[in-house]
Swiss-Prot record:
GO cellular component, one term: ribonucleoprotein complex
Database matches in NCBIfam families: L31 (TIGR00105), PRK00528.1 (NF001809)
Keyword rRNA-binding annotated: yes
Gene: rpmE
Function: Binds the 23S rRNA.
Protein name per Swiss-Prot or TrEMBL: Large ribosomal subunit protein bL31
InterPro entries in UniProt: Ribosomal_bL28/bL31-like_sf (IPR034704), Ribosomal_bL31 (IPR002150), Ribosomal_bL31_A (IPR027491), Ribosomal_bL31_sf (IPR042105)
C-alpha cells in the first residue's frame, strides 16, 4: 500500500435515531467525532416494510405531490 494517499481511518461514535450509540471505525470526520443519523435500519421504510411515514427532506415529497398528485393514476 502506498504511504500518504489513503484517508485517515479512525474511531467515531454513531448515534441512531432511537438514541442507541456504538463505536465504529470510519474515514468520516476526525477521531472522536459523533455522527447523528436521521435514518437508520430501525426507521428506514426499506427495512420496516414501509409502515412509517416518509420524511419530507427539503420539501421534495411535497413538491412532487403538488406537481403530480392530481393525475389520478
Amino acid at each position: 500500500m502506498k504511504a500518504n494517499i489513503h484517508p485517515d481511518y479512525h474511531t467515531i461514535k454513531v448515534v441512531m435515531t432511537d438514541g442507541t450509540e456504538y463505536m465504529t471505525r470510519s474515514t468520516w470526520g476526525k477521531e472522536g467525532d459523533t455522527m447523528n443519523l436521521d435514518i437508520d435500519p430501525t426507521t428506514h421504510p426499506a427495512w420496516t416494510g414501509g409502515s412509517q411515514t416518509l420524511l419530507d427532506r427539503g420539501g421534495r415529497v411535497t413538491k412532487f405531490k403538488n406537481r403530480f398528485g392530481n393525475l389520478g393514476i
